[in-house]
């Protein structure tokens, strides 16, 4: 219902009025018919948890678990690894006709966490090389640039092979690295090698990872959390950086190697490693930042200490140099130029939140019959009994929840536990379960994300400044879809759109 913004356009990039066009092909891989497969042109059926080999670990506990197939994947379903392996083989075959030869790509990467690039923004002052304020230096005042050579005919060969960089370069994370050259040689005998007749083959004499089980064993063999020798090497590297004695943390497990066969017989506790600042030495329960406090390993911050103040000009501009309380945005449901809603906007306006689900893990299990029977068996929104009473809403009434972004149709759950002025809808309640049509849009109601929109937080775009530097799944911009308001109305008639 929102109208396009015609006034506030980006000023520093070229705005193109003509777009590429609509999405022509959507392919999804899933073991359940969630909302994404329902919209997809092609659905690749995936194996479930107990139909494939895989690894399971988490920062919630110090153990590593295996997945082993109790049965083969049903019908045409395959494991994730086998699906991508099949796709890579098909693409490589097609590339011989459509993309022969090699191509060069220029790839940009952001200034990296735990690297020299953390020093890119001196004194937290950002100067724009594109405006001539500072010299453009790749990896310092601008992104890194690398030339990557692509050969699409060899995608499959590379996919099923553990590549040669492990022989030459160190591996690791969080500023700690070590050589795995010996482990790479071990994997050749453990997993077998490719021996093609073609002397130009990129995979010749290299370890085979053509099955998910082999991939799992390769990961376990080159990880410092499952290989005691590599754990010792990781602490050795951190000792060199800090001058502090650390190798004793994993000394008792230096000769230990955790294999897939080991964890199949019994899940194993991971080996302490310098990659993480915790310590589970001698069976101690893992706790974060143990080595920082007890062994005086500097925190990975600008000062080497726990930091609350960020001396960076962008954080200062947004008033976030220190952790501060910020009130919510004003309760806007529609813009002045947006389409008018049928019947006019309703008086009940609430903050709209989408917390993690109570009867599902993201979209998984949310349509499971057993889980659905634990509550209302369809989409629900929660609001306070005070708000409900003031607007004649009774528990289990059908509601329309809407704003300029979209509409949700769901049953009301009234509760004294909900704060007045707030509504939430547990996330991942897909619209294919008991979702009626909307009286506002004349189409079926949307999912929990229908009223939300994605915002980028500007301070998360800062980089090249000590701990405020990018690393995948560590620090960087996220999709923030909070801080929105919705109007709420009772539905006059529930239409299931079945005609």
Positions of predicted regions on the chain:
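Long, low-complexity segments enriched in small/aliphatic residues
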Residues: 120-368
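Beta-sheet entry/capping signal
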Residues: 23-26, 42-43, 273, 298, ...
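Long, contiguous, secondary-structure-rich segments that constitute the structural scaffold
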Residues: 82-150, 214-257, 266, 356, ...
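Glycine- and acidic
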Residues: 65-73, 382-383
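Short His-Asn-centered micro-motif
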Residues: 28-30, 46, 355, 383
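Flexible glycine/proline-rich, aromatic-decorated loop/lid segments
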Residues: 35-67
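Phosphate/diphosphate-binding loops
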Residues: 15, 24-25, 69-92, 400
């Amino acid at each position: 219902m929102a109208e396009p913004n015609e006034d506030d356009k980006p000023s520093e990039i070229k705005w193109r009025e003509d777009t590429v066009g609509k999405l022509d092909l959507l392919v999804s891989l899933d073991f359940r018919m969630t909302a994404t497969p329902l919209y997809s042109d092609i659905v690749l059926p995936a194996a479930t948890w107990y139909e494939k080999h895989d690894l399971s670990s988490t920062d919630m506990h110090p153990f590593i678990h295996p997945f082993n197939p109790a049965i083969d994947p049903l019908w045409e379903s395959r494991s994730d690894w086998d699906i991508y392996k099949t796709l890579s083989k098909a693409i490589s075959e097609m590339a011989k006709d459509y993309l022969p030869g090699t191509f060069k790509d220029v790839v940009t990467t952001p200034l990296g966490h735990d690297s020299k690039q953390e020093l890119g923004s001196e004194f937290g002052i950002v100067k724009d090389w594109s405006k001539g304020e500072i010299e453009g230096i790749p990896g310092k005042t601008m992104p890194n640039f690398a030339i990557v050579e692509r050969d699409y005919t060899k995608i499959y060969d590379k996919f099923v092979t553990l590549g040669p960089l492990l022989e030459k370069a160190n591996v690791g994370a969080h500023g700690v690295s070590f050589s795995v050259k010996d482990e790479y040689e071990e994997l050749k005998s453990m997993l077998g090698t490719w021996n093609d007749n073609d002397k130009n083959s990129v995979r010749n004499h290299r370890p085979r990872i053509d099955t998910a089980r082999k991939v799992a064993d390769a990961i376990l063999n080159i990880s410092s959390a499952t290989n005691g020798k590599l754990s010792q090497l990781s602490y050795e590297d951190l000792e060199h950086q800090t001058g502090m004695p650390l190798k004793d943390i994993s000394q008792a497990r230096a000769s230990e190697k955790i294999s897939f066969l080991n964890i199949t017989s019994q899940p194993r506790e991971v080996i302490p490693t310098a990659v993480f600042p915790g310590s589970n030495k001698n069976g101690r329960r893992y706790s974060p930042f143990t080595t920082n406090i007890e062994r005086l390993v500097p925190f990975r911050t600008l000062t080497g200490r726990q930091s609350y103040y960020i001396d960076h000009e962008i954080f200062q501009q947004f008033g976030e140099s220190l952790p501060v309380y910020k009130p919510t945005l004003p309760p806007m449901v529609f813009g002045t130029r947006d389409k008018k809603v049928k019947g006019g906007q309703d008086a009940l306006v609430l903050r709209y939140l989408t917390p993690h689900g109570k009867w599902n893990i993201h979209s998984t299990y949310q349509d499971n019959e057993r889980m659905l029977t634990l509550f209302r068996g369809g989409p629900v929104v929660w609001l306070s009994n005070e708000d409900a009473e003031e607007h004649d809403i009774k528990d289990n009434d059908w509601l329309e929840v809407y704003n300029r972004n979209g509409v949700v149709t769901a049953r009301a759950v009234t509760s004294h536990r909900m704060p007045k002025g707030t509504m939430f809808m547990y996330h991942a309640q897909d619209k294919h379960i008991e979702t009626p049509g909307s009286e506002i849009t004349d189409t079926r109601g949307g999912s929990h994300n229908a009223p939300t929109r994605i915002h980028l937080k500007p301070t998360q775009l800062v980089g090249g400044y000590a701990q405020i530097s990018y690393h995948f799944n560590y620090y960087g911009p996220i999709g923030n879809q909070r801080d929105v308001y919705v109007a709420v109305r009772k539905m006059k008639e529930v239409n299931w759109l079945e005609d």
